[in-house]
Swiss-Prot record:
This is Asparagine--tRNA ligase. Gene3D superfamilies: Bira Bifunctional Protein, Domain 2, Nucleic acid-binding proteins. Keywords: Aminoacyl-tRNA synthetase, ATP-binding, Cytoplasm, Ligase, Nucleotide-binding, Protein biosynthesis. Pfam families: tRNA-synt_2, tRNA_anti-codon. The lineage of its organism: Bacteria, Bacillati, Bacillota, Bacilli, Lactobacillales. Homodimer. PROSITE patterns: AA_TRNA_LIGASE_II (PS50862). One of its GO terms (cellular component) is cytoplasm. It comes from the Bacteria. Transmembrane segments: none annotated. The keyword DNA damage does not apply.
């Protein structure tokens, strides 16, 4: 009986007859031979249908197939040195499963809004396939890294009655007889987890009602948020750089084909696996920007132009340390050497991609944290449980958050975050 395989496993079946369930992405014909470009969700390769080797009805069907028709292909696997994938199938039989009429995304160029309107179909393209393969690998590597480091996965709630970074930019919803919010971050809950289990990480969706149309913003995205008890900032920075280097190395090891489809140079990515990453302070960053003629001063937050410039100055990801209190959230630890700034850091990705990680050591003192919550204009009652963590065995602890789509955008060298998630949500995009 002919074995059913996936395209990605073709190398293990050279000169064997196999059966593959596939979709047609494109085709071309040269008289007595029809070339079928096939995909099955694991890879892409070519099917060759020769008029001399198949029944007339099979050759006629091959010539009539429409883009995105689904079928069973039976044939013999051969090596194909002309393609990067390296293999093709000599077709012996075609069984049509599902026809496709007037597929809207033809091989011609389409505008971005058209493609986003048809995102459910755009995902089938080679480029989107490659991006999602790399996204999958980075999620897999995330779990592997933190499991190896002794962390446990913790799942924070999505519906909350409080916000870790203030009540602006929140999506509000009715929750029976009260208001609830879609979570901006799982960090506060991860801190509770760290006090219980030592080292935890979260991986899930978060929501920001930011009315921003930049290439770096989505209203729904995924965050990886580790939290570590008995951990100071220096130790956290080392975990952060090891984690990012691990992600990049995992993509290099396991995603050569997707990287090729994206024309992403592996040699460039390799330099991001070298540790340690450089560090500068916020004050040094301000001076660098001012020396470059940019209109910034101490106390300003960095936007895309500033982050792009700073990250362009380094060949690796770079940490920017110790931001002023006025531009960071209330829960961070005050710098013992400068009470106007926090013990915190952002990691900026090179090639102009900007922030991919934000992290800090957390405030451990009950009264100091209580005052910070009040100073931020937040309701103490909503944070009573969070303050409890400082009443019952408070310890030094640190954590950080990596924006998954930002990291994917950098690793894949994309122009916009919208391609880094299957169905992007933006200020003007809620479907499909």
């Amino acid at each position: 009986m002919t074995e059913q395989i996936r395209i990605i496993d073709a190398k293990e079946h050279v000169n064997e007859e196999v059966k593959i369930g596939a979709w047609l992405t494109d085709k071309r014909s040269s008289g007595k031979i029809t070339f079928l470009q096939l995909r099955d969700g694991s890879a892409y390769f070519q099917g060759v249908v020769s008029k001399a080797d198949v029944p007339e009805e099979v050759f006629s069907l091959a010539k009539e197939l429409r883009q995105e028709s689904s079928m069973w292909i039976t044939g013999v696997i051969h090596q194909d040195s002309r393609s990067h994938f390296g293999y093709e199938i000599e077709v012996r039989n075609i069984e049509l499963v599902g026809d496709s009429h007037d597929y809207p995304i033809s091989p011609k160029e389409h505008g971005i809004e058209f493609l986003l309107d048809h995102r459910h179909l755009w995902l089938r393209s080679k480029r989107q396939f490659a991006i999602q393969q790399i996204r999958n690998e980075m999620i897999r590597a995330t779990f592997e890294f933190f499991n190896n480091e002794g962390f446990i996965k913790m799942d924070p709630p999505i519906l909350t009655d409080s916000a870790p970074e203030g009540t602006t930019e929140l999506f509000e919803t009715d929750y029976f007889d009260k208001k609830a919010y879609l979570s901006q971050s799982g960090q506060l809950y991860a801190e509770a987890g760290a006090m219980a289990y030592g080292k935890v990480f979260t991986c899930g969706p978060v929501f920001r009602a930011e009315k921003s149309k930049t290439r770096r913003h989505l209203t729904e995205f995924w965050m990886i948020e580790p939290e570590m008890a008995f951990c100071h900032q220096e130790e956290s920075l080392k975990v952060q750089e090891r984690y990012v280097a691990y992600l990049v190395q995992s993509v290099l090891d396991n995603c050569a084909y997707p990287l090729h489809l994206l024309d992403r140079d592996p040699e460039v990515l390799k330099q991001y696996t070298k540790l340690p990453y450089p560090r500068i302070t916020y004050k040094q960053a301000i001076k660098m920007l001012q020396d470059a003629g940019m209109d910034v001063k101490y106390g300003d937050d960095f936007g895309s132009p500033e982050e792009t410039y700073l990250s362009d100055q380094f060949d690796q990801p770079v940490f920017v340390l110790n931001y002023p209190k006025t531009i960071k959230p209330f829960y961070m630890l005050t710098d013992p050497e400068d009470d106007q700034q926090y013990v915190c850091a952002d990691m900026l990705a090179p090639e102009g991609y900007g922030e991919i990680i934000g992290g800090s050591e957390r405030e451990t003192d009950y009264d100091t944290l209580k005052n910070a919550i009040e100073h931020a204009g937040l309701d103490l009652d909503e944070y009573e449980w969070y303050l409890d963590l400082r009443k019952y065995g408070s310890v030094p602890h640190s954590g950080f958050g990596l924006g998954l789509e930002r990291a994917i955008t950098w690793v894949c060298k994309l122009d916009h975050l919208r391609e880094a998630i299957p169905f992007p949500r933006m200020i003007n995009r809620l479907k499909p």
